[in-house]
């Protein structure tokens, strides 16, 4: 497994498992356990996914079964907009996420959107970070101009900005801004987010055939080679492909391929 070192020194796996749209509690527990058992160490959830408790239960089960330790894992959650009203609502949201997970702390906590009083919400996150409740703090869906203004003002700079990133939406300006402020890009919808059909894309199929990989692996590796962390959401019926996705972090495609995508 490859890791990225964040601007505060914390190491983050480059390929992760996202639980967006895994609503059923028992199903979520099971797929999280299966993902960890298969080798995933980054688990990505959010308050708005309403499954922080199930993620925590799956994690604790994996620890109980000796698959991993808590320190082996990197658990991410996010604060939703309704909790960004002010400092106090944000502080309660942070504590609620930690309590629901039952894990004692979170490795990464993000502002899910640049909405509401997100500066006050960030101050609450800074304080929780200093208290050790959050090992790293970041943002999500911050456009380049918003991220620039944000980084110039806050005391603790975000370590990550999770944004939509895939070959159909490359976000070059966003990546340039993140690099300037030493913010690691993290992709949501690395496979196109349902608006595109990369698995029927002849160019991508050709690249996959060339390297004897799946189209999904090519897309994930494309992001990884651009310095992007990928917490891919995996449908339950494709859980058996996890091992192949983990292998993405160790497979290198020639740079001649990348400009083609």
Descriptions of predicted regions:
Residues 17, 43, 55, 75, ...:
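Conserved, mostly hydrophobic/aromatic
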Residues 13-15, 75-77, 109-111, 139, ...:
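Hydrophobic faces of well-ordered beta-strands that scaffold small-molecule active sites
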């Amino acid at each position: 497994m490859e890791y990225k070192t964040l601007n505060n020194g914390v190491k983050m796996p480059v390929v992760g498992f996202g639980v967006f749209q895994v609503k059923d509690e028992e199903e979520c527990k099971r797929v999280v356990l299966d993902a960890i058992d298969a080798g995933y160490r980054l688990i990505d959830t959010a308050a708005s996914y309403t499954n922080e408790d199930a993620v925590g239960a799956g994690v604790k089960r994996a620890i109980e079964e000796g698959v991993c330790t808590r320190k082996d894992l990197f658990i991410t959650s996010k604060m939703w907009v309704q909790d960004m009203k002010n400092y106090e609502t944000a502080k309660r949201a942070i504590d609620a996420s930690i309590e629901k997970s039952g894990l004692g702390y979170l490795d990464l906590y993000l502002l899910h959107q640049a909405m509401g009083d997100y500066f006050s919400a960030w101050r609450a996150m800074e304080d929780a970070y200093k208290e050790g409740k959050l090992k790293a703090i970041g943002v999500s869906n911050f456009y380049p101009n918003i991220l620039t203004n944000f980084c110039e003002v806050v005391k603790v700079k975000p370590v990550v900005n999770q944004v939509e990133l895939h070959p159909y939406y490359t976000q070059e300006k966003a990546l340039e801004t993140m690099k300037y402020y030493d913010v690691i890009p993290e992709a949501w919808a690395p496979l196109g987010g349902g608006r595109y059909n990369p698995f029927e894309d002849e160019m991508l199929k050709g690249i996959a055939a060339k390297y004897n990989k799946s189209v999904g692996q090519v897309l994930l590796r494309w992001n990884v080679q651009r310095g992007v962390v990928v917490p891919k959401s995996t449908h339950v019926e494709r859980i058996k492909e996890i091992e192949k996705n983990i292998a993405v972090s160790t497979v290198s495609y020639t740079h001649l391929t990348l400009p083609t995508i």
